[in-house]
Swiss-Prot record:
Record-linked Pfam families: Kinase-PPPase
GO molecular function per UniProt: ADP binding; ATP binding; phosphotransferase activity, phosphate group as acceptor; protein serine/threonine kinase activity
Organism: Polaromonas naphthalenivorans (strain CJ2)
Protein name in UniProt: Putative phosphoenolpyruvate synthase regulatory protein
Keywords from the UniProt entry: Kinase, Nucleotide-binding, Serine/threonine-protein kinase, Transferase
Catalyses which reaction(s): [pyruvate, water dikinase] + ADP = [pyruvate, water dikinase]-phosphate + AMP + H(+); [pyruvate, water dikinase]-phosphate + phosphate + H(+) = [pyruvate, water dikinase] + diphosphate
Entry's EC annotation: 2.7.11.33, 2.7.4.28
Amino acid sequence: MSNRTVFFISDGTGITAETFGNAILAQFEISPRHVRLPFIDTVDKAHQAIRHINHTGELEGKRPIVFTTLVNMDILAVLKAQCNGMLLDMFGIFVAPLESELGIKSNHRVGRFSDASKSKAYDERIEAINFSLAHDDGQSHRDLAGSDVILVGVSRSGKTPTTLYLAMQYGLKASNYPLIPEDFERRQLPPALVPHRKKIFGLTIAPERLSQIRNERRPNSTYSSLANCRNEIHEAEAMMRREGIRWLSTTTKSIEEIATTILQEIRPERLEY
């Protein structure tokens, strides 16, 4: 049974909704299509999500299943009132309604997963992690073409933890490459990155936060001074604008939020599987 779509909706990254929903769905012998809709944090976004869900139901001729971890009650109320899918809140009772909706009995086994698919996904993630480690901080130019995404930004802007999270959570081969003063002087991307421009995504950060982070590593140095951080960030953002590189600020975002935002931009299909 595969012609059924399951949505995971959250006003955050959606990881909790997806994890919880998948734990419930693993009790059933089905292989549905998964769609994660993160950052549904306004009524307008809720309406967009509702249109997506309802349209999917019309196309498939079956109600989509919708797991949600929405915290905002106004947004949740809109979803409950207008969504034609089977809506399951995190705090509801899940298994019994799914038995009724799917027309099959739950296996009632804890932690039941498809061994073959999980093994393949596990192998892909290990391969992605090894790739990301080998291509951390520009240490290898070899096989950059094999990257799913190449993160660029100044030192300590969050590139390494984000690439590793993308590899571990999504199996993406994520490289990262530092932008350094020599690049700013040449006013060009590092030569190794030029052929892969379409795969590049930039990270920036508030100079004050960057200075704080760098001071933990190299206190009272030119490298960590606020003036130097301001200059590097200014030059890096100017380069990204010149090169037409998409970028975001990591200043107030968690690694999960950064990774999910990047995924939405460069590989939205990875939110469906």
